[in-house]
Amino acid sequence: MRFDILTLFPAMFQGPLTESILKRAQQAGRIEIHLHDIRQWTTDRHRTADDTPYGGGAGMVMKAEPLAAAIRAVRAADERPGVTILLTPDGELLTQQIVRELATLPRLLLVCGHYEGIDERVRETLIDRELSIGDYVLTGGELAAMVVVDAVARLVPGVIDSESIVEESHSDFLLEYPHYTRPAVWEGRAVPPVLLSGHHGEIARWRRAERLRRTLVRRPDLLARAAAAGVLTKADLALLAELGWRPETSNGA
């Protein structure tokens, strides 16, 4: 899978994209990550990529000409079809379901917004999708682009063991169960005995129950989505009822 990141600040990506899982995935040829400095497509000697907004107001707006030229050139650099995504607080909220969808694509072009945003005409003509990583505002789209690359890349076949992904938080609208490792007792706190029992069936049931309990406590809004998606079994629903879950209040209100 290929990621193309269009940004005014490529140096921000030094480090995060060359460590840990992303580093190994690139070395193994599972993913490619290409950085593109939008200023390379400016035409003046000052490499101006932004200007004041028409109508007045604070801040600057990313200019249409260099950004459009960058998107078109990067699209043409590889024959694989790609989806052009603008990272912006105005966008659709990124979820694990969207991440799964994006991971099936051969190529993503991630456009990092900055300043007050980009010229609306570029959004209307060259942007396929807009994504946000949360209901807050960052200085630019660079950190959001890193989040998208990390979240999507780990679902590309061969990047992470598939068994590790199955029970991760949000994989089926449920949060992940607690994890423990050696020593068995730390500062007087012991690992749950079931995890030391060697009984795989009991361990699986404990982990499922902990996922349900943790989701109910921390993200009850997810339970309604899990129920609607049909991922909750009769045993799940019975346990949740014992824990006091009522579907009509699962939106967290």
Swiss-Prot record:
Annotated binding of S-adenosyl-L-methionine, by residue: G113, I133, G134, D135, Y136, V137, L138
Coiled coil regions in record: none
Pfam families, per the entry: tRNA_m1G_MT
Signal sequence coordinates: none
GO molecular-function terms, A-Z: tRNA (guanine(37)-N1)-methyltransferase activity
UniProtKB keywords: Cytoplasm, Methyltransferase, S-adenosyl-L-methionine, Transferase, tRNA processing
Annotated family: Belongs to the RNA methyltransferase TrmD family.
GO cellular component: cytosol
A single BP term in Gene Ontology: tRNA N1-guanine methylation
Catalyses which reaction(s): guanosine(37) in tRNA + S-adenosyl-L-methionine = N(1)-methylguanosine(37) in tRNA + S-adenosyl-L-homocysteine + H(+)
Function recorded in the entry: Specifically methylates guanosine-37 in various tRNAs.
Name used for this protein in its record: tRNA (guanine-N(1)-)-methyltransferase
NCBIfam families, per database record: PRK00026.1, trmD
InterPro entries recorded: Alpha/beta_knot_MTases, tRNA_m1G_MeTrfase_C_sf, tRNA_m1G_MeTrfase_TrmD, tRNA_m1G_MTases_N, tRNA_MeTrfase_TRMD/TRM10
Oligomeric and partner information: Homodimer.
EC number(s) given by UniProt: 2.1.1.228
